[in-house]
């Protein structure tokens, strides 16, 4: 909450509060900002929680936004191509967390694809520019 204001848009790229001892609405009601959930494969508890919806501005499988003058596709899953990917748009995805497997190796070749995994971003909300820096730092550990 110290990094998010009440007016900020916060995009959760799936797997919200997975393996948690509390209900999703318990977390959502405490978090600042306009929260948008991009559905992940571990979001059944959030989707089934009746009270969670009142804390979410949107719930989508995929969303396209413009932020900081950039076209961005948000999807829980890493994609080989995405909306306007050949025209300079960015992809922000989750799902693979901090894995360094063949999917990770492939996604490193996608110039404007960013892993929003919490483990890559110090388990804290980040801006677009911080996401870029954190992905670069994570990839530099491969060298």
Regions flagged by a language model, labelled:
Residues 1-62:
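Core catalytic region of metal-dependent phosphoesterases/phosphodiesterases
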Residues 52-142:
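Conserved beta-sheet core of the metallophosphoesterase superfamily
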């Amino acid at each position: 909450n110290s990094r998010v204001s009440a007016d900020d848009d916060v995009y959760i790229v799936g797997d919200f509060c997975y393996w948690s001892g509390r209900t999703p609405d318990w977390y959502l009601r405490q978090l600042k900002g306009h929260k948008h959930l991009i559905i992940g494969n571990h979001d059944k508890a959030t989707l089934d929680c009746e009270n969670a919806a009142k804390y979410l501005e949107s719930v989508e499988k995929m969303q396209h936004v413009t932020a900081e003058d950039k076209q961005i596709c948000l999807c829980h899953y890493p994609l080989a191509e995405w909306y306007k990917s050949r025209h300079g748009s960015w992809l922000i995805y989750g799902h693979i967390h901090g894995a360094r497997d063949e999917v990770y190796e492939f996604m490193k070749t996608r110039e404007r694809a960013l892993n929003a995994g919490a483990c890559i971003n110090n388990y804290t909300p980040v801006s677009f520019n911080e996401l870029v820096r954190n992905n670069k730092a994570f990839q530099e550990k491969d060298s």
